[in-house]
């Protein structure tokens, strides 16, 4: 099976208001704009016991094993949404990490949107938003 290719665009916060804070996430209001800078995500189903997630590119060095993409798949597994499907994901990073451009968040959001729109997973928009909020404050901002 060949890889599918997804562009995961950076986002720019034009205005940001933190409404409330918790230990892990902030409740925010934001005005965003997507920019032409993007990471490239390659994804395909595989026969494996686990998902294979890898990052490469100039801005991949500091990405650890616990990241927004691995967190997304952990949530999908725990909610039994994937139904034992496994994926290989290769992400070429062009968006600098820790730069406020939402690179990691947008990677997870792009994958979630892809899986839903291609009907690889059966999920309603309301559930997608709940999952997005578990991963990051700014994920629910994306156009799921």
Where on the chain are the PLM-derived regions?
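ATP-binding N-lobe of GHMP and related small-molecule kinases
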Residues: 1-99, 116-123
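Short, well-structured alpha-helical segments that form the helix of a local strand-helix-strand
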Residues: 124-135
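Conserved small/polar residues in nucleotide/adenosyl-binding loops
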Residues: 142-144
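Predominant activation on well-ordered alpha-helical scaffold segments within soluble catalytic domains
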Residues: 70, 109-113, 129
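Short, small-residue alpha-helix embedded
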Residues: 105-119
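Flexible lysine-rich "adenylation lid" loop at the C-terminal edge of ANL adenylation domains
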Residues: 101-103
């Amino acid at each position: 099976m060949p890889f599918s290719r997804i562009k995961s665009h950076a986002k720019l916060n034009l205005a940001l208001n933190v409404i409330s804070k918790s230990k892990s996430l902030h409740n925010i209001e934001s005005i965003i704009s997507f920019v032409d800078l993007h990471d490239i995500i390659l994804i395909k189903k595989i026969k494996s016991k686990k998902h294979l997630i890898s990052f490469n590119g100039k801005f991949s060095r500091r990405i650890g094993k616990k990241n927004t993409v691995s967190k997304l798949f952990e949530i999908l597994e725990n909610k039994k949404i994937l139904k034992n499907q496994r994926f290989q994901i290769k992400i070429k990073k062009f968006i600098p990490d820790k730069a406020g451009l939402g690179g990691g968040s947008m990677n997870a959001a792009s994958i979630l949107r892809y899986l839903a729109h291609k009907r690889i997973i059966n999920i309603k928009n309301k559930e997608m938003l709940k999952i997005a909020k578990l991963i990051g404050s700014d994920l629910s901002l994306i156009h799921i």
